[in-house]
């Protein structure tokens, strides 16, 4: 956004009702933390707020944290006035004795590792901020960073990627507090910048929008059908948020009903009209087994007051699938240790508590140190099943099955029905009862039934 030339740039590549939360009179944080406080007081995809400053810069957190919270409360109020059915979902923490929603805003304070000169350039500095933030990589969160350091081009007020369905390190927006955008805490230019970059982060301007700007006016990341639009690429200065409109004409990026991506559908927006206010439950437990490199993760169904849920499956912290089923199949290298997690997601994008489990392929469920907690890996197949007849008796014998936890017994079946369980690798039966198809499967000390191996037909 440029002021007279102030420029807002797109870097390509628990609200309960429609009533806005009151302005906070104080930020209720009782500590200063560089990380994301847990537990979250909001259930769902959300924006986490970060105050960042360079290694050689002054720490203005104490002075700026309340103005930041007040601007975000004003953004919440403005958004609900524009669309009574939606509002951005911000990360809150249940600070004790706090009587306002945005007083509970979870704001992290981060001193970046490099001097201000590393972050002052518009483009390379933006990338350096993203790299040096580190640790803000929750795939279910987007990040709004208020950077308190000098910038080479003070007309550039902020920058954000446009990643509609991404969270984590690929979804970090930056607002430059020391640009010529002014009015932090008073719903003025900084608030306009913040909304502008937030909307970019939610996926605007989508390809196919009817009013993209020409390259010399901000490019196709912005609409050019009117300066009142909060996503217009520049401002003449002195703007206030109340004078701005969320998608002028409602035909470019919000509530348009067209074929292009619609920010109104973003899972990072709370659906205020829905009676569903509670998140789904977490799966009661996870179970994971493997045979070779084939891994099967399963869990009991979660419950939700709004009905059906889907499940987000994560591998080593990254989402890999979303499914209605209560199981997930994966391929992993034998001996590799993988962390799997599952969260239930309801129809209005509330997320249940994450349930996680660590698994070593070919060994079983392990703790943080890699020690075996529960053997869930089936023994290998029984090989070389043989039969020898001696008079009226038939003796079956077989080779050992492989299992890291050691085999406890072998289950012997004839025509699919169990006839014996033995710790030995030999079984003698009457010849008159030997006709049929015989098979043997190992059972390990944890009770896992082994993979089916060779069978033997006796006549």
Predicted regions span which residues?
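Active-site scaffold of zinc-dependent metalloenzymes
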Residues: 154-187
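A recurrent domain-boundary module in secreted/ectodomain proteins
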Residues: 244-281, 363-373
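Beta-strand-rich modules
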Residues: 330-350, 431-449
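Propeptide-to-catalytic entry region of secreted or membrane-anchored zinc metalloproteases
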Residues: 21-142, 147-154, 273-275
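Bacterial N-terminal signal peptides
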Residues: 6-15
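Pro/Thr/Ser/Gly-rich low-complexity, intrinsically disordered linker/stalk tracts
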Residues: 275-306, 350-404, 448-459
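Recognizes extended acidic, P/S/T-rich segments that occur
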Residues: 310-335, 353, 409-433, 451
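The catalytic-center signature of Zn2+-dependent metalloproteases
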Residues: 21, 175-256
């Amino acid at each position: 956004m440029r002021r007279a030339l102030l420029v807002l740039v797109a870097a390509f590549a628990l609200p309960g009702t429609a009533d806005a939360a009151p302005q906070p009179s104080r930020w209720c944080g009782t500590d200063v933390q560089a990380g994301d406080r847990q537990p979250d007081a909001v259930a769902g995809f959300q924006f986490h707020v970060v105050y960042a400053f360079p290694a050689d810069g002054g720490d203005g957190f104490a002075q700026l944290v309340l103005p930041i919270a007040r601007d975000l409360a004003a953004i919440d109020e403005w958004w609900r006035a524009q669309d009574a059915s939606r509002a951005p979902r911000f990360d809150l923490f249940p600070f004790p004795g706090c009587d306002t929603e945005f007083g509970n805003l979870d704001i992290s304070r981060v001193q970046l590792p490099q001097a201000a000169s590393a972050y002052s350039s518009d483009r390379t500095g933006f990338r350096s901020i993203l790299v040096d933030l580190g640790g803000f990589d929750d795939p279910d969160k987007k990040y709004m960073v208020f950077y308190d350091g000098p910038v080479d081009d003070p007309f550039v007020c902020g920058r954000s990627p446009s990643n509609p369905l991404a969270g984590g390190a690929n979804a970090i927006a930056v607002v430059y507090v020391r640009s010529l955008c002014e009015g932090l805490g008073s719903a003025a230019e900084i608030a306009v910048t913040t909304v502008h970059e937030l909307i970019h982060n939610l996926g605007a301007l989508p390809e196919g929008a009817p009013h993209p700007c020409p390259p010399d006016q901000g490019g196709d990341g912005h609409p050019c059908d009117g300066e009142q639009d909060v996503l217009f690429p520049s401002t003449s200065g002195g703007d206030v948020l109340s004078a701005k409109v969320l998608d002028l004409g409602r035909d470019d990026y919000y509530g348009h009903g067209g074929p292009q991506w619609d920010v109104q559908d973003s899972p990072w927006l709370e659906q205020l009209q829905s009676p569903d206010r509670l998140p789904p439950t977490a799966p009661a437990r996870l179970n994971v087994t493997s045979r070779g490199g084939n891994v099967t993760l399963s869990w009991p169904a979660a419950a939700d007051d709004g009905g059906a849920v889907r499940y987000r499956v994560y591998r080593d912290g990254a989402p890999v699938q979303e499914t209605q089923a209560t199981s997930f199949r994966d391929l992993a290298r034998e001996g590799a240790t993988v962390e799997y997690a599952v969260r239930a997601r309801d129809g209005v994008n509330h997320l249940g508590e994450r349930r996680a489990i660590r698994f070593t392929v070919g060994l079983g469920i392990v703790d943080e140190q890699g020690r075996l907690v529960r053997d869930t890996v089936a023994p290998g197949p029984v090989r070389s099943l043989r039969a020898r007849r001696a008079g009226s008796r038939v003796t079956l014998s077989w080779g050992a099955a492989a299992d890291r936890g050691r085999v406890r017994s072998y289950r012997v079946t004839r025509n699919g029905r169990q006839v014996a369980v033995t710790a030995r690798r030999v079984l003698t039966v009457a010849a008159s009862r030997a006709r049929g198809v015989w098979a043997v499967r190992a059972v390990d000390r944890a009770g896992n039934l082994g993979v089916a191996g060779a069978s033997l037909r006796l006549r």
